[in-house]
């Protein structure tokens, strides 16, 4: 099961939270969901050069708050916050009659972030760099940041081959079945002359102990 399912979805409610933090009734749920999807696609496309790792969306009655996790916060913020204001104005086409708030969160170690690693490998594949070299170099850089393990997979017509295949590489340990294991997951697609190549990255950051268990142990000590 752990090998097949998205590691984020499997751990939601256990050690991971939701990327969309809002509640809506049946009447508004679909509209909000479509709105969220449009916002995510637009922000990823508009700020691709900033290295967007994750976008969290929080909603209140007349307010939409975006938490944008990025490797290059300066690119988004701009001179004197001009970049954020420009982004807010552009987002009004998706969010009607609501106040948009944008919070920028810096990703400290971009080379060990699964989503940014996947996008980096995809970008190298589009530049016709060997998929083996791209995967191995990205993994080696990530391991230097103190992570416990990393696994990468590339699927498609690798190297322009007639038959599509999947190739995996991994270093360290990746306990996908263990729910308390903090697994970061990223996916990206490379558009090559032979077609699309899918890139998946799993990063193991160590175990997360449930807070109740930790509190109980502290009380007994």
UniProtKB/Swiss-Prot annotation:
Coiled coil: none annotated. Keywords: Ribonucleoprotein, Ribosomal protein, RNA-binding, rRNA-binding. The keyword Ribosomal protein applies. Residues 39-108 form the KH type-2 domain. SMART domains: KH (SM00322). InterPro entries: KH_dom, KH_dom-like_a/b, KH_dom_type_2, KH_sf_prok-type, Ribosomal_S3_C_sf, Ribosomal_uS3_bac-typ, Ribosomal_uS3_C, Ribosomal_uS3_CS. GO terms for cellular component: cytosolic small ribosomal subunit. One of its GO terms (biological process) is translation. The keyword Ribosomal protein applies. GO terms for molecular function: mRNA binding; rRNA binding; structural constituent of ribosome. Belongs to the universal ribosomal protein uS3 family. Part of the 30S ribosomal subunit. Forms a tight complex with proteins S10 and S14. Binds the lower part of the 30S subunit head. Binds mRNA in the 70S ribosome, positioning it for translation. This is Small ribosomal subunit protein uS3. It comes from Clostridium beijerinckii (strain ATCC 51743 / NCIMB 8052). The lineage of its organism: Bacteria, Bacillati, Bacillota, Clostridia, Eubacteriales.
């Amino acid at each position: 099961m752990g090998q097949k399912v998205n590691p984020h979805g499997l751990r939601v409610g256990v050690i991971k939270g939701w990327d969309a933090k809002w509640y809506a009734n049946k009447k508004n749920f679909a509209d909000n969901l479509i709105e969220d999807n449009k916002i995510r696609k637009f922000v990823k496309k508009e700020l691709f050069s900033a290295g967007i790792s994750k976008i969290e969306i929080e909603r209140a009655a007349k307010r939409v708050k975006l938490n944008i996790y990025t490797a290059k916060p300066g690119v988004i913020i701009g001179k004197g916050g001009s970049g954020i204001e420009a982004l807010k104005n552009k987002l009004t086409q998706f969010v009607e009659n609501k106040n948009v708030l944008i919070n920028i969160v810096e990703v400290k170690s971009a080379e060990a972030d699964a989503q940014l690693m996947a996008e980096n490998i995809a970008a190298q594949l589009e530049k016709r760099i060997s998929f083996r070299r791209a995967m191995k170099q990205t993994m080696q850089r990530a391991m230097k940041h103190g992570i416990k393990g990393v696994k990468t997979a590339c699927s498609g017509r690798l190297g322009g081959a007639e038959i599509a295949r999947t190739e995996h590489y991994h270093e360290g340990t990746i306990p996908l079945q263990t729910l308390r294991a903090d697994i970061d997951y990223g996916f990206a697609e490379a558009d090559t002359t032979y077609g699309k190549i899918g890139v998946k990255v799993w990063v193991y950051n160590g175990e997360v102990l449930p807070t109740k268990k930790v509190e109980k142990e502290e009380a007994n000590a």
